């Protein structure tokens, strides 16, 4: 009985570990901001309040914050999105929110690997 329980627990841990891995086929994109506040590496990237990726790096270049993100290719985020830094609540963590500007038709093309989100 104990052997079965141990085997079950090991199986659950392996499945969880494999599911938590960042897929190597993630779409890597970049956005530049004047200010990101206390945005942290590994912060979620959301679209329509659904997580579609995560922040992989934050660095300074030309007096602006450059944020690298890994986006799930299955999310098919349109190429014309705008990236905004916002809080999840008044005291909550900062996240990246991807939105399509009002009045702008959705692009038929998803974000390409290496793309820069130009409007932030």
Question: What label would you give each PLM region?
Answer:
Residues 58-120:
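Non-cytosolic, membrane-proximal linker/loop modules
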Residues 34-66:
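Short beta-strand/strand-turn micro-motif
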Residues 3-13:
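Sec-dependent N-terminal signal peptides
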Residues 18-20:
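C-terminal motif of bacterial Sec signal peptides marking the signal peptidase cleavage site
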